[in-house]
Amino acid sequence: MRIIAVLSILAAAIVAACGGDSVLSPSGSGRLSLMIKDSPYSDAKALLVTFSEVTAHRDREGGFSKLPFGDATATSRTCDLKKLVDRQDLLGVGTLPAGHYTQVRVVVSSAALYFDSPSDGPPCAATIQAPAGRSATIEIPSGEVKLNRQFDVGESGATSMLIDFDGDRSVTETGNGRFRMTPVIGIVSVQ
C-alpha cells in the first residue's frame, strides 16, 4: 500500500514537471493588427467615429491586453467610415502576449455626421479635422462592443483581424435632426 502511495506521488510530480500546453501558456509574444472597413451611413458625406480603446482577452485567466493605436502615443483613433467603403485601414497594432484569445473589445467614444463636405486626409488618424458645413453629433448610449471570436497570437508571429463597422445599421435618426449610434461591428476574417 505504501509503494502505491509513493508511486502515485511520484507520478503526480512527473506530470506537474512536464508543464502545461505551450499554446495556452506561451512565454513569448506576437503581433496583432486590427484592420477596419465599413459599409457606412448613406445620407452623409462623412461619418467620423472616434475609438478610445481596443483590447483583446486572453483565455485562461490571461485578462485583457490593450492594443495600441497606429501611433503608440495616441490615446484615440478617429476613422471616417465613408472612406472605408471599398478599402480598409489600420485601427490598432501592437505586441501582445502569445496565446489563445477569445474576445476583442472596441470602445467608441464619439461620432458625428457631416452632410455637406467629405473629410480631408487619410481614412484613419489620431485626429481628423471636421469637414465644413452642416453636422450632427451622434449620441452613443453604450460604445463598448464585444467581438467574441477565438484566435491565436503565435510566439514571434503575426495575426491580422479585419472588422466591419456597419454604419447603416449603427446609426439611426431619432427625430428633430438627432441621431443615435449603437455600434454594429462584425469580424470579417482572422489570419
Region locations from a protein language model:
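Bacterial N-terminal signal peptides that target proteins for export
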Residues: M1-L7
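Compositionally biased amphipathic helical and low-complexity segments enriched in hydrophobic
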Residues: S8-A11, S25
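Residue-level signal for mature regions of secreted extracellular proteins and peptides
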Residues: A11-A12, A72
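C-terminal motif of bacterial Sec signal peptides marking the signal peptidase cleavage site
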Residues: I14-A17
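A short, solvent-exposed, low-complexity linear motif enriched for acidic/polar residues
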Residues: G19-Q191
